[in-house]
């Protein structure tokens, strides 16, 4: 199956390979409607199953699958990695390119591009101090005691591994379903988190969020160039004193 390199998609089926971590996938999902604007007959999204219900609200996606080696994901006319979409948007005709700005002045969907029905949990702050156990886990993760000093204990833990000092979320399967996570997050006052997937979910939902950055040498490019999420404010590790006031303004 050939990689899509900008050929006509009229009457064609294309498989989009979700890449990198959950945050990256949520961040780049805003560009998926572009493929339908370019005439794709069918868009197949190959991704982790925990994201299926969340992205089910996007009518531009015709089929979801988590089977990379057989079935519908292997039967398309083309395939493309989701992170490559902005590049091909930059090469698209003006009528399509203008619908999906991606530059320092404006990034499409920065105001929020996903919906969620708030759950019925009492309104509190949401917190997450830990990232997935990848290469940058110890760079981005914050000591929970330090997070407690900054935000207090009147909050829900959105860390799927442990709750520590904060209230647990209902045991409803949210740890394996990003759509349920979105519903709980939408019910919260706001979110304080380190740089991890929940930050992107909050931004995509338009939830007011403070993202605590790692040391400057490890700060991810996405927080340096353009505004991906209007509802997200970043703070450096020497600016933690600003967080209580940012919480009060949520």
Task: Locate the predicted segments by residue.
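Short acidic-hydrophobic, aromatic-tinged amphipathic segments that line or gate anion-handling sites
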Residues: 63-68, 173, 232-239
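Donor-binding and catalytic core of enzymes assembling or modifying cell-surface/extracellular glycoconjugates
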Residues: 1-9, 148-210
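A nucleotide-sugar donor-handling region in carbohydrate enzymes
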Residues: 49-54, 61, 65-124, 130-131
């Amino acid at each position: 199956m050939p990689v899509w390199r900008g050929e006509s998609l009229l009457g064609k089926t294309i498989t989009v390979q979700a890449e990198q971590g959950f945050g990256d996938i949520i961040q780049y999902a805003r560009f998926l409607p572009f493929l339908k604007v370019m005439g794709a007959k069918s868009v197949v999204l190959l991704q982790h199953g925990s994201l299926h219900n969340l992205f089910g609200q996007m009518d531009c996606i015709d089929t979801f699958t988590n089977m990379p080696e057989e079935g519908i994901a292997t039967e398309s006319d083309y395939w493309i990695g989701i992170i490559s979409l902005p590049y091909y948007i930059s090469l698209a005709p003006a009528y399509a390119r203008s619908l999906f700005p991606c530059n320092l002045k404006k990034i499409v969907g920065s105001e929020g591009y996903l919906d969620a029905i708030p759950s019925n949990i009492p309104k509190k702050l949401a917190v997450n101090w830990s990232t997935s156990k990848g290469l940058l886990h110890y760079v981005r993760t914050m000591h929970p005691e330090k997070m407690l000093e900054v935000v207090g204990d009147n909050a829900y833990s959105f860390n799927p591994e442990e709750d520590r000092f904060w209230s647990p979320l209902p045991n409803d399967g949210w740890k394996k379903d990003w759509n349920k996570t979105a519903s709980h997050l939408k019910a919260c006052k706001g979110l304080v988190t380190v740089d991890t997937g929940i930050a992107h979910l909050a931004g995509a939902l338009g939830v007011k969020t403070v993202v605590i950055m790692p040391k400057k040498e490890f700060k991810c490019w996405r927080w340096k160039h353009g505004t991906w999420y209007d509802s997200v404010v970043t703070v450096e590790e020497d600016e933690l004193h600003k967080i209580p006031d940012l919480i009060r303004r949520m």
